[in-house]
UniProtKB/Swiss-Prot annotation:
UniProt-recorded name of the protein: Fructose-1,6-bisphosphatase class 1
Originating gene: fbp
HAMAP family (alphabetical): FBPase_class1 (MF_01855)
Keywords, comma-separated and alphabetical: Carbohydrate metabolism, Cytoplasm, Hydrolase, Magnesium, Metal-binding
Membrane-spanning residues: none
Length: 338
């Protein structure tokens, strides 16, 4: 069997579809190398003294783990000098990071959640890195936060690396979703799943059931119907899955189908949701749609949302298309009910 590594895949995609110019290819290769370095630190765990809290907080008001800080630094250092980027933005940093003047600047913007699911680090559950690539609107000019304010439909690439039993890089450049597994013996990501597709129907849902009392009625309605099983209106039994790591939950959905929900709840009614639009929802929505699924905030396609700020939050419903459409329909029906 012919082994295709990430570099070869990117070169052949450019030849066939003209979607990956050299600068974007180099950027994606650097991100992949950074993910390899993060994977190495994650795998060492307690042996390298990288578990536990860093004793600091991020802009989200969350306690940073040591590996959060390490992963953020790895991505910044790996990408700042290559000449492919104008700026970067991270879930862990309050403002964007403009490429220092001593380095050449490129035409892309990189956004990332350096270590998603970090509450799972110390208990050895799968975590990951999520990233999104945008064009710099005004190449050659000074970067402002407004340059990042592009809807998810403008992404030129998105992906994640999941650090589990294997380290897997999942990538889209707008021409389907492809998975690459890290071969540690040779140190390269090898194409192992081409053109991944999410089944349109499912019997699995992923949601934090402990928050049920705080949900809006459309979400309660959907979950109640799932829990009713064969005796309820859906006429089939559902299983619940919840890992508390978006990367791990979405990876399962890309692999075998399902629906992932992190809805608005009434504990913080002024916030549209919990997950970050730019670092989590947009790249995952791009991947899910490219795999034949759907992604909404309950009412609107996530990729159509116009961002207003870098750390904007959003409700997320994504996965198997028919289930996402049903949840969206319930939200729209609730709005129309007097």
């Amino acid at each position: 069997m012919k082994r295709i590594n990430l570099t070869r895949y990117l070169i052949e995609e450019q030849r066939e579809h003209n979607t990956i110019p050299a600068e974007l290819r180099l950027l994606l290769e650097v991100v992949a190398r950074a993910c390899k370095a993060i994977s190495h630190s994650v795998n060492k765990g307690a042996l390298a003294g990288v578990l536990g809290s860093a004793g600091t907080g991020n802009v989200q008001g969350e306690t940073q783990q040591k590996l959060d800080v390490i992963a953020n630094e790895v991505l910044l250092e790996a990408n700042e000098y290559g000449g492919n980027l104008a700026a970067m933005a991270s879930e862990e940093m309050e403002s964007f990071y403009e490429i220092p003047h001593r380095y050449p600047k490129g035409e892309y913007l990189l956004l990332f959640d350096p270590l998603d699911g970090s509450s799972n680090i110390d208990v050895n559950v799968s975590i990951g890195t999520i990233f999104s690539v945008l064009h710099m609107p005004k190449a050659g000019e000074a970067v402002t936060e407004a340059d990042f304010m592009q809807p998810g439909s403008k992404q030129v690439a998105a992906g994640y690396a999941v650090y589990g039993p294997q380290t897997t890089l999942v990538l889209t450049v707008g021409n389907g979703v492809h998975m690459f597994t890290l071969d540690r013996e040779v140190g390269s990501f090898v194409l192992t799943h081409r053109d991944v597709k999410i089944p349109v129907d499912t019997k699995e849902f992923a949601i934090n059931m402990s928050n049920m009392r705080h949900w809006a009625p459309p979400v309660r309605r959907y979950i109640d119907e799932c829990l009713a099983g064969t005796e309820g209106p859906r006429g089939k039994d559902f299983n619940m899955r919840w890992i508390a790591s978006m990367v791990a939950d979405v990876h399962r959905i890309l692999t075998r189908g399902g629906i992932f929900m992190y809805p608005w709840d009434k504990r913080e009614p002024g916030k549209a949701g919990k997950l970050r639009l730019m670092y989590e929802a947009n790249p995952m929505a791009f991947l899910v749609e490219q795999a034949g699924g759907a992604a909404t905030n309950g009412e609107q396609r996530i990729l159509d949302i116009q961002p207003e700020k870098l750390h904007q939050r959003v409700a997320v419903v994504l996965g198997s298309k028919n289930e996402v459409d049903r949840v969206t329909q319930y939200h729209l029906e609730a709005k129309q009910t007097p």
